[in-house]
């Protein structure tokens, strides 16, 4: 494993830094977390800037190391994250790039890269979260369309999305068809008749998630990514990107927050508490280790062809808990100020509670690590 950067990679870093120094001072103020239409406009405008500068495809066509450099430098510079483009850039886009037909790639990828279209994720259901393969949303063929009925929950960005990466059951579960089979991956247009979206307000006041109800929604068969009943395999590609790369920029952000916490503690007198200093030191070591793990995962992805491997589950497991510990420490540093919902760290602390659940619970990640890395049996 080689964790050093080549001259070409360092040149990429230098060029990116120069570009960021020019464009970031000109950006408008970021909308509030509660203003999702405003956030969509802001996030897609940022993506268009990246596209025009030649950085729009960095999540797909660049090498894994260049993606890592991009996420590191944009976060250090305080640039916007992917925001409303999250599903399109980090879930659906890489999946379509890997599994889609040439026609599908030509249709869906350029609008995502330009910031013209936003995607949401329709995976989880009220009775199919961690056990995603238990999903019940049904799709049946009617000529050159699928007719879809069912419901989804925790649908990211549904309120502002143009498209949905949707998992449906196209064959009922039976002795001949286990639940992991009979699933199909569809690209559903969000303006199709029969779709009802109800926003879900989080503890932090955001409505980035929603319930979605589907009543005989017609989706063209041409919008199927992969083969019918082979959607679980396609979904594993999606989830490998979600767990392998989607949180990389956040590690850089957490390391920055650690420095800010130390400065805040020195300023408000809490730095004199040795227990707090030990806590922050332990977190610093944890996030340094997570960054090295990220570099290792990226090195492995580059060696094996670009798709993140199961090492992403190790990262997701450790990062979820470390993030919660970080913002618990932030509450200790802020004291009574941690009750102020206008403070960024307070909102981050509330949102961190979901990290051991979202994108696969910690228990699911432990199972993946046990079975696919340690080779332990599946017996319970």
Segments (PLM) and residue ranges:
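Internal helix-loop-helix
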Residues: 47-110, 114-115, 157-163, 287, ...
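Glycine-rich phosphate/cofactor-binding loops in nucleotide/flavin-utilizing enzymes
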Residues: 69-70, 91, 232-247, 334-380
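A structural signal for short hydrophobic beta-strand segments in well-ordered beta-sheet cores
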Residues: 137-139
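Amphipathic, small/basic residue-rich leader segments at the start of a protein or domain
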Residues: 1-86, 107, 111, 260, ...
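A short, Trp-centered hydrophobic/proline-enriched beta-strand micro-motif
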Residues: 115-123, 166-167
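A short core secondary-structure module
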Residues: 144-145, 149-198
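Glycine-rich beta->alpha junctions and the first turn(s) of the following alpha-helix
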Residues: 3-5, 195-290, 355
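C-terminal helix-coil-helix/basic helical segment that borders enzyme active sites and/or dimer interfaces
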Residues: 28-37, 266, 270-277, 288-344
């Amino acid at each position: 494993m080689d964790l050093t950067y080549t001259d070409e990679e360092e040149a990429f870093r230098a060029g990116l830094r120069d570009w960021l120094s020019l464009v970031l001072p000109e950006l408008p103020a970021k909308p509030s977390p509660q203003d999702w239409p405003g956030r969509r406009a802001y996030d897609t405008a940022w993506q268009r800037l990246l596209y025009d500068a030649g950085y729009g495809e960095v999540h797909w066509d660049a090498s894994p190391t260049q993606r890592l450099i991009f996420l590191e430098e944009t976060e250090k510079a305080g640039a916007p994250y992917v925001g409303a483009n999250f599903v399109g850039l980090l879930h659906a886009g890489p999946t379509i790039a890997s599994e889609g037909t040439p026609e599908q790639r030509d249709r869906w990828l350029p609008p995502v890269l330009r910031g013209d279209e936003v995607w949401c994720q329709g995976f989880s259901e009220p009775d199919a979260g961690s056990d995603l393969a238990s999903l019940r949303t049904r799709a049946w063929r009617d000529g050159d369309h699928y007719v879809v009925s069912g419901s989804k929950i925790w649908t990211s960005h549904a309120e502002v999305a143009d498209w949905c990466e949707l998992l449906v059951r196209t064959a009922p579960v039976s002795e001949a068809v286990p639940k992991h089979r009979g699933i199909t991956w569809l690209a559903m247009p969000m303006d199709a008749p029969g779709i009802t979206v109800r926003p879900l307000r989080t503890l932090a006041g955001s409505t980035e998630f929603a319930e979605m109800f589907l009543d005989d929604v017609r989706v063209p068969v041409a919008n199927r990514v992969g083969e019918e009943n082979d959607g679980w395999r396609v979904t594993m590609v999606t989830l490998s990107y979600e767990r392998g790369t989607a949180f990389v920029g956040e590690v850089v952000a957490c390391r920055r927050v650690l420095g800010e916490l130390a400065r805040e503690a020195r300023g408000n007198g809490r730095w004199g508490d040795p227990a707090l200093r030990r806590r922050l030191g332990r977190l610093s070591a944890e996030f340094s280790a997570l960054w090295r793990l990220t570099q290792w995962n990226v090195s492995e992805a580059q060696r094996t062809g670009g798709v993140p491997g199961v090492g992403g589950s190790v990262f997701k497991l450790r990062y979820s808990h470390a993030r919660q510990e970080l913002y618990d420490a932030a509450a200790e540093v802020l004291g009574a100020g941690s009750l102020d919902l206008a403070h960024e760290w307070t909102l981050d602390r509330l949102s961190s509670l979901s990290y051991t659940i979202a994108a696969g619970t910690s228990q699911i990640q432990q199972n993946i690590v046990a079975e696919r890395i340690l080779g332990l049996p599946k017996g319970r």
